[in-house]
Design a protein with these regions (language model features):
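N-terminal Sec-pathway targeting helices
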Residues: 1-11
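Active-site mouth of glycoside hydrolases
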Residues: 36-205, 209-210, 217-221
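Soluble or luminal CAZymes and related metallo-dependent hydrolases
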Residues: 64, 116-120, 156-160, 208, ...
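A structural motif corresponding to the C-terminal end of an alpha-helix
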Residues: 75, 127-132, 164-175, 261-269, ...
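Aromatic-rich peripheral "rim/lid" segments of glycoside hydrolase catalytic domains that contact
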Residues: 275-336
Length: 336
């Protein structure tokens, strides 16, 4: 009888503990002019985009989360941006314990996985809105480049985006709602999307986003963060003294210059997420090996060849070996 009673008490305590954690964990993210405040202190995003897919796979996996978090902490990362929600309390708890916060991204049509189209994103917010690791709710990822996903009319996306943001505010008033836009939006769109509290911008303007920051200063008073920025570690052509082929120096140099611009303009921008933490070998061909793949040279503003080789963007490689840019980011994030 005593054993049964003890087990019953343990069960009750565990349930109460779980409810206490989910109900009473306090985090409040506010906006003050162009800044994010976490529990009344300014929070400057020093982040990486995080989409960990293992060698030989095409699906996200957190099997290496412990190793990854250790590397992130060493690099001074305080924020990760994920492209779809993490539905695993144990993973969220590990991220929180590491002192890292999450920008949770929701897609429009993810076949019902916490997406906007089905409305299931609301269930995720209800489930995890009190988790200390979550910094921002982010809707979409540069969908403005893809009107074909919205019956050929990008305004269909903007309407869905603004409505989804409104629904989030009804569920969780403790965090801002953002979106990740491809390049800078115009003033009219910012005004139209009045439920968006802050803007993330995916920006690839060579190694100098300073013009974009000045543009933002003139069109909006809302907080801005660079939701994607950076460079890959492969040169499709020889250019500017950087040799063709894998070139970690080119990546390191570009990221250093980009980060300098961000930290030197911290009165305008509220942070940056370097794209990305680990190489994605699933993107351009055989997921069992690293493939060269990207657009033709000079077709986009990616330093220093204009070609975004999709499988070479990590600050670490697929085996978690540090690239040269890792030390650059570590220095900048830990000393700013």
């Amino acid at each position: 009888m005593k054993l049964k009673y003890s087990l019953f008490l343990i069960f009750i305590i565990s349930i109460l503990g779980w409810n206490f954690y989910n109900c009473c964990e306090e985090i409040n993210v506010e906006i003050n002019e162009r800044n994010f405040l976490v529990n009344n202190e300014r929070y400057f995003i020093k982040g990486v985009c995080y989409d960990p897919v293992l060698l030989g796979s095409k699906k996200r996996s957190f099997d290496k989360i412990d190793e990854d978090l250790k590397l992130m902490v060493e690099a001074g990362v305080n924020t990760i941006r994920v492209y779809s929600p993490i539905d695993d309390t144990s993973i969220l708890d590990k991220i929180d314990k590491a002192g890292i916060k999450i920008i949770v991204g929701f897609g429009y049509n993810q076949e019902g996985y916490y997406d906007i189209l089905s409305g299931s994103f609301e269930n995720y917010i209800k489930k995890y809105k009190n988790h200390n690791a979550i910094l921002l709710w982010e809707l979409g990822n540069e969908y403005n480049y893809h009107p074909e996903w919205f019956e050929g009319d990008i305004n269909n996306w903007y309407e869905a985006l603004n409505e989804a943001a409104h629904k989030i505010k009804q569920i969780d008033s403790s965090r801002p709602v953002t979106t990740a836009h491809g390049e800078i939006p115009d003033k009219t769109l910012i005004k139209k999307l009045d439920n968006i509290d802050a803007w993330g911008i995916n920006v690839y303007r060579w190694d100098d986003p300073s013009d974009l920051l000045e543009e933002w200063l003139n069109i909006s008073e809302k907080p801005l963060y660079l939701s994607e920025a950076g460079s890959d570690s492969y040169m499709t052509i020889e250019k500017y003294g950087y040799s063709k082929g894998e070139n970690q120096l080119a990546q390191a140099d570009a990221n250093e210059k980009i980060l300098d611009v961000v930290f030197n303009n911290s009165d305008i921008v509220s942070g940056i997420l370097i794209f990305q933490f680990v190489d994605g070998l699933w993107k351009a061909g055989n997921p069992d090996k690293q493939d060269i793949g990207g657009w033709a040279p000079n077709s986009i503003g990616v330093p220093y060849d204009g070609a975004p080789n999709e499988e070479f963007w990590g600050i670490v490689d697929i085996e978690r070996n540090k690239k040269k840019t890792f030390e650059v980011i570590k220095n900048k994030y830990n000393n700013n």
